[in-house]
Swiss-Prot record:
Known pathway: Cell wall biogenesis; peptidoglycan biosynthesis
Protein name: D-alanine--D-alanine ligase
Protein purpose: Cell wall formation.
Transmembrane residue ranges: none
Entry GO CC: cytosol
Binding site for ATP: 154-209
Species of the source: Shewanella oneidensis (strain ATCC 700550 / JCM 31522 / CIP 106686 / LMG 19005 / NCIMB 14063 / MR-1)
Family per similarity comment: Belongs to the D-alanine--D-alanine ligase family.
Signal peptide: none
UniProt cofactor note: Binds 2 magnesium or manganese ions per subunit.
Domain (ATP-grasp) ranges: 124-330
Length: 336
């Protein structure tokens, strides 16, 4: 049986470029444990240029091959691609649209599902349409006096708010606001990251995460894990990835009643199926002191860094990541 030429595409143009490279390390290590794959790792830089790990400039053509700038090197045909890209253009659905156009099979959610989840406003509309509770919010489409007034009114009503760029990941362009004097500056900063902004009520709650993925034709939802931060600390981009981070994680959240855990997992599967996700996701929830469950967000290509929850939760559920990848890839290619 011939090996599968697998393109591991990583990097991208977002603030999460470097995190994507760390996740790609995990994928590369996992794929190396299987003899099925010839893996070519290619980095997509912030300017849309492709380069191999060996430093060769190249491009992915519509003939489904990697063509090198050095024409003495033969083109490398691509059978399958893993777009290990957090943020733009991976989780936004843009790169998937190109793969669809050139009929190149790929790992992960399809373009529309990715786009729907990445935009926080669209995602919340979907959550509500599916009957899944989520945090109270308003959304804004431009930085003007009306937006400032709406945000100040939300702060007065809710006491504390989060102002978030609607189309960013990993808490990029996301700010906690407790004082009216901070509204103008925070709104301006958030609109600097995206043309749409969402304002959410601050929820004092535990932050629980569920790995949801397809395995042998079944949608699996793991037991919820938990992100634990210091009191009143927001789990920012830096708090997630800085070496000095005081946040810690539990692969299985402690002291969550069984019925609450079951309901969280049921909501996670409902969101996965209802929004037509594919292969993998990490779905994040809030759990309040009185056991109110609120869906926070969906990550359609969750991180796989040494501190990331998705691979840990999958493994804790009894599944091997290499075998999981092999099953997904072989099943998809067999269905072509």
């Amino acid at each position: 049986m011939s090996k599968i030429n697998l393109l591991l595409l990583c990097g991208g143009g977002s603030a999460e470029h470097d995190i994507s490279l760390l996740s790609a390390n995990y994928f590369e290590t996992s794929l190396a444990k299987s003899e099925q794959f010839n893996v070519l790792r290619v980095v997509l830089d912030k300017f849309g240029q492709y380069q191999t790990a060996a430093g060769d400039d190249c491009e992915l053509t519509n003939n489904r091959e990697i063509r090198f700038r050095d024409e003495s090197k033969a083109p490398w045909p691509v059978d399958y691609v893993i777009p290990c890209i957090h943020g733009y253009p991976g989780e936004t659905g843009d790169i998937q649209s190109y793969f669809n156009l050139i009929q190149l099979p790929y790992f992960g959610c399809e373009s529309e599902a990715s786009s729907n989840c990445f935009n926080k406003i669209t995602a919340k509309m979907w959550f509500s349409a599916l009957g899944i509770p989520n945090t109270p919010y308003i959304f804004l489409n431009q930085y003007d006096d009306e937006a400032i007034a709406q945000t100040q009114a939300a702060l007065e009503k809710w006491g504390s708010i989060f102002v978030k760029a609607a189309s960013q990941g990993s808490s990029v362009g996301c700010y906690k606001v407790d004082e009216a004097s901070k509204v103008l500056g925070v709104l301006k900063d958030a609109f600097g990251y995206a043309p749409y902004v969402i304002v959410e009520k601050t929820i004092k709650a535990r932050e629980l995460e569920v790995a949801v993925y397809e395995y042998q034709g079944e949608v699996i939802a793991t037991l919820p894990g938990e992100i634990i931060c210091d009191s009143n600390t927001f789990y920012t981009f830096d708090e997630k990835y800085a070496k000095s981070s005081k946040a810690r994680t539990d692969v299985v959240a402690q002291n969550v009643p069984t019925d609450i855990s079951d309901q969280i997992r049921a909501y996670a599967i409902k969101a996965f199926k209802g929004m037509k996700l594919r292969h993998l996701s990490r779905i994040d929830f809030f759990l309040t002191a009185d056991n109110e469950i609120l869906l926070n967000e969906i990550n359609t290509f969750p991180g796989s860094t040494p501190i990331s929850m998705f691979p840990k939760m999958l493994q804790n559920h009894g599944h091997d990541f290499t075998q999981y990848l092999s099953l997904v890839i072989n099943s998809q290619l067999a269905a072509k």
